[in-house]
From Swiss-Prot:
Claim: Chaperone is one of the keywords in the record: no
Example of a GO biological process term: photosynthesis
Record PANTHER family: PHOTOSYSTEM I ASSEMBLY PROTEIN YCF4, PTHR33288
One GO location term (cellular component): chloroplast thylakoid membrane
Family as reported in the entry's similarity comment: Belongs to the Ycf4 family.
Pfam families noted in UniProt: Ycf4 (PF02392)
Segments passing through the bilayer: 26-46, 66-86
Keyword Thylakoid: yes
Protein name per Swiss-Prot or TrEMBL: Photosystem I assembly protein Ycf4
Membrane topology value: Multi-pass membrane protein
Annotated source species: Pyropia yezoensis
């Protein structure tokens, strides 16, 4: 939740999707590495030097060339998947809390298809609390959840790099204060 648009009775938190610098970095690095493996494997098969900075024709096609071609193909498909998630901006959206209309709207973009746009809408009266879930350790998790009276728990924070503890606490407190509900800790 990076940007917040707030007018006295409407609060809108924008959620960053897959268009993060780290995703651009990994998609590019994986593509370059995979392309190198693929070209080295194909060079050993065709006995033509497709990589200008090395002599890949000395590789024996079976087993080294086949393995390099296989790993290169898998890497190219993985980087293609990463680039498509960046282009489609998977996970982007917003959390809108509207006191005038009495609704909470959670909107996210998914993969193309009939369910590309995911929109959850709740009446503010259905909201029981805002919950903070903090797990420290090797893989830390710091998330904010919207808890409804019918026991549903909906995540409000973005996926990816965990927010600072102070940011999570501050955002959760602001949302709970805005909605006039209880703030829970896990």
């Amino acid at each position: 939740m990076k940007k917040t648009l707030s007018i006295h009775s409407v609060r809108k938190d924008l959620i960053l999707g897959s268009r993060r610098l780290s995703n651009y970095w990994w998609a590019t690095i994986i593509f370059i590495g995979a392309l190198g493996f693929l070209l080295a494997g194909l060079s050993s098969y065709f006995q033509v030097d497709l990589l200008p900075f090395t002599n890949s024709t000395d590789l024996v096609f079976i087993p080294q060339g086949i393995v390099m071609t296989f790993y290169g193909s898998i890497g190219v498909f993985l980087s293609l998947f990463l680039w498509l998630t960046i282009i489609w901006n998977i996970g982007a959206g917003y959390n809108e809390f509207n006191k005038d209309k009495g609704i909470v709207k959670i909107f996210r973009l998914g993969f193309p298809g009939k369910n590309r746009k995911i929109c959850l809408q709740f009446n503010i009266k259905e909201i029981k609390s805002i919950k903070i879930d903090i797990k420290e350790g090797l893989n830390p998790r710091r998330e904010i959840y919207l808890c409804t009276k019918d026991k549903r728990v909906i995540p409000l924070t973005r996926v990816g790099q965990p927010l600072l503890l102070s940011e999570v606490e501050e955002q959760a407190a602001e949302i709970a204060r805005f909605l006039d509900v209880v703030l829970e800790g896990a």
